[in-house]
């Protein structure tokens, strides 16, 4: 049985459910740390709706220090969505994340950063040509990045699968080389 640690914050006022994931790629520490801190800092008394945080999706990869891969099968989790309930470990994890968390969200933010071998600048993806595109574009406008990519990649990733199923989604890339700074973490939290 798969177990993914998560935090559910229920606001005192009704509203949408926002899902925030990090650690799909397990050595992308900026998003992981930002999600952990958000889970401790968000004030439910001022929150409208719910926030679900999954700070470390790929726990086995994290614990076993595999870069961008699920430890048990060596697969890149963000290339196997929608996954398969009867498949390999990565495929089962992708299937569970989609069915349990993503399908039940009204909006989705997937936090990433450059893994141990990646140098990059902060940017944001959203999927074009979907019913969720307009809302995703409004979400992107709230992200403090200089570059935005309107993607057309429709396979493999969590944010694009969510968008194809009507859940407005963005993927934020911030940080590089599996390193992080306080400034990057604060920017992800904003």
Predicted regions and their residues:
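Structured catalytic-domain cores with a bias toward divalent-metal coordination
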Residues: 1-190
């Amino acid at each position: 049985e798969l177990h993914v640690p998560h935090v559910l914050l229920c606001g005192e006022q009704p509203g949408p459910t926002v899902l925030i994931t990090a650690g799909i790629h397990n050595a992308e520490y900026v998003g992981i740390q930002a999600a952990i801190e958000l889970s401790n800092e968000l004030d439910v008394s001022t929150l409208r709706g719910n926030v679900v945080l999954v700070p470390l999706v790929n726990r086995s990869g994290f614990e076993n220090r595999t870069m961008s891969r699920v430890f048990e099968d060596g697969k890149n989790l963000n290339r196997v969505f929608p996954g398969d309930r009867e498949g390999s470990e990565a495929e089962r994890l992708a299937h569970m994340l989609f069915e349990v968390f993503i399908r039940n969200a009204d909006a989705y933010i997937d936090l990433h950063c450059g893994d141990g071998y990646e140098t990059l600048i902060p940017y944001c993806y959203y999927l074009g040509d979907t019913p969720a595109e307009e809302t995703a574009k409004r979400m992107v406008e709230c992200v403090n990045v200089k570059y935005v990519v309107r993607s057309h990649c429709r396979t493999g990733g969590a944010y694009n699968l969510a968008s194809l199923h009507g859940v407005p989604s963005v993927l934020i890339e911030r940080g590089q080389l599996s390193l992080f700074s306080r400034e990057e973490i604060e920017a992800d939290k904003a």
